[in-house]
Amino acid sequence: MITLNFIWNSNEIFFSLLGINIRYYSLMFVVAFSLGWYLTKKIYLNEGKTVEQLDSLFIYTAIATLVGARLGDCLFYNWDYFQHHLLEIFLPIKEKPGGGWELTGFSGLASHGAAIGIILAMFLYIRKYKDMKLSWVLDRIVIPITIGGMFVRFGNFFNSEIVGKVVSNTFPLGVKFVQGEDLSTYKAMSITGANTAKEAYYQIVHNPQYADILAAIPYRHPAQLYEAAGYFVLFWVLWYVYWKTDKRNKPYYIFGLFLVRSASWWNS
C-alpha cells in the first residue's frame, strides 16, 4: 500500500520583526479576517447595507473572536495555570522560570470561547442598528466564519495542536507530530541537552542517536486537516444556500446548518 504518512516538525514562526515572532497561526487569523471581510462585503452590498455597517460588524466580530477565544482557553482549559499568572491572560508575555518576562504573543485560543463571544457581540451590534435582527446577522456571518475556521485549523496544524487519535504506522494519512502531546518541550530538551526547543526537536528528528525516541512517537490522525477540509465543504454549502436558494430568508436556517455540522466536529 502506498502511504502518505510523514514526520511533522514544523517551525511555527513565519518570520521575526523587531524581536517579535510572527507565527503561522497569527498569519492564518489575518487571512481569515481579511477574507471574511471581503465575503461579508459582497453579502452586505447585495442586501443594500452600508460599508459603515460592514466595518462596524468587522470590529465587533474581530474583538469578540480574539477576546472570547482567549478567555475561553484560559478559563475553560488552562485555569490551573492562569489563576497563578493572571497578567498573562491579557498581555502577550510569559513569566520566565528564573524571573522576568518574555514577549511571546498569544498562543492559547479556544473556538468555543470565540463562538460565545461572537454571539454576545451580535446582541450589541443589533442594538446599534435597529433595522437588523439577530437571526439576519447570524445567518450571514457564519458563512465567512466557516471559511475562516479552515484557516484557523491550518494554524493548529502548524502548531501541532488538536491532534487526532493514534493510528498504525501503515495508516495512509498518519502524521507523526514531533512537537505534539507525545513529546513535551521539557522532555525533548532534557533528553538532548539542547538550549532551545527548536534545537531539541531538530536533534530528535535528524540525529540517529535519538532514533528510538523518534520511533516511539506514534502516528496520529491529522484531525486539523480533516476539520479544515470539512469547513471548506461546509462553506460552499452555506454559500450555495445563500446565493442560490430562498432559504436565506428563513430565520436561523443557515445558522442552524452551521451549528449542526460544527457541533458534530466539536463532539468528535
How would you describe each model-predicted region?
Residues 1-268:
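A feature for loop-to-transmembrane-helix boundaries and adjacent hydrophobic helices
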